Amino acid sequence: MAEAGVAAASLFGADRRLCSADILPPAEVRARIEVAVLNFLAALTDPAAPAISALPLISRGAANRGLRRALLRDDVSSVYLSYASCKRSLTRANDAKAFVRVWKVMEMCYKILGEGKLVTLRELFYTLLSESPTYFTCQRHVNQTVQDVVSLLRCTRQSLGIMASSRGALIGRLVVQGPEEEHVDCSILGPSGHAITGDLNVLSKLIFSSDARYIIVVEKDAIFQRLAEDRIYSHLPCILITAKGYPDLATRFILHRLSQTYPNMPIFALVDWNPAGLAILCTYKYGSISMGLESYRYACNVKWLGLRGDDLQLIPQSAYQELKPRDLQIAKSLLSSKFLQDKHRAELTLMLETGKRAEIEALYSHGFDFLGKYVARKIVQGDYI
């Protein structure tokens, strides 16, 4: 269990009001791992040293979270973690395995960086499962430990040699030029679109060319393909992007790059009217709590296009569904957060009061071509929050 405390000096850099993770070259990350090991060995050999479990991690608990609010209209708000620390203790039964996992993951990252390789979280899990099955019995152990290492070394996940496992795709009024000079015209692709690589190093080098006026983030692949099949971007100059569900890091990264390249191009989200849909929108908009040290690198000023409460009149009663226990859990978490803005909170409250949820596909009751018209009308009329 993490034990919160007042932050002391971290291994790398003075603690600040807003903690962050740095993008570092492999040699610097390996050097930080070496420093962590030397500090640990020094504590072992020094009889006057405090407990050897002094791993200065940043707490991801609710009390240590905050929202870096935008000061100007076009600025972006993002989730951040403050200075409160926590410990992984070798002497505490509940913490011992988590303590060992941190060193195991750092050892693996040191090796990966030395070989000049990149691995996914899934690949890392299976490697650790093979080498240390006692400590890594599920993917969650790896995911949480990687965030502990990010917290300890104050470097991004990509800097550790761990790349995103991307499901994302994009299509529309966009030409992408890769590092090898190849060009992809996303307006002439099939409805599956252009697959987004999980290598953030490659994504950071892409060159964009676009005459689009809008970016539309779509929760579901099926909706993305419907809009792509209808070629909505032919009459509504836009770029469509999807992570096919909960946003992965690579999709968030390329969306952020697009927002930086085209700062005057508004971003709209098309998600289901349920707590999970709102959670997805908030992840794009503010970043994720689990990656609080680097959330600001991927946050975008995303507007909620639909579905929203005002759209329920378009949906037949038979298309409504009851909220599920998982919906209620997500809603409770969102309502307790510090970043949920008033209009989003009102939508979530309406879901809970009615006990209902609705999916975007319910709009097909008006015909398959209605979805594109619905999206275009709401954008043109400024019907978003």
Curated annotation (Swiss-Prot):
Residues the entry annotates as binding Mg(2+): E219, D272
Record keywords, A-Z: DNA-binding, Hydrolase, Isomerase, Magnesium, Metal-binding, Nucleus, Topoisomerase
What superkingdom does the record give?
Answer: Eukaryota
Active site residues per record: Y126
Residues crossing the lipid bilayer are none
Q: Which GO terms describe its molecular function?
A: ATP binding; DNA binding; DNA topoisomerase type II (double strand cut, ATP-hydrolyzing) activity; hydrolase activity; metal ion binding
One GO cellular component this record assigns the protein to is: nuclear chromosome
Q: So which cofactors does this thing need?
A: Mg(2+)
Kindly list the places in or outside the cell where this protein is found, as annotated in its UniProt entry: Nucleus
Entry EC no(s): 5.6.2.2
Show the CDD domains listed in the entry.
Answer: TOPRIM_TopoIIB_SPO
Family designation = Belongs to the TOP6A family.
The record's annotation in PANTHER family points to:
MEIOTIC RECOMBINATION PROTEIN SPO11 (PTHR10848:SF0)
Subunit record text: Interacts with TOP6B.
The role this protein plays is: Required for meiotic recombination. Mediates DNA cleavage that forms the double-strand breaks (DSB) that initiate meiotic recombination.
Q: What is this protein identified as?
A: Meiotic recombination protein SPO11-2
Its gene is SPO11-2
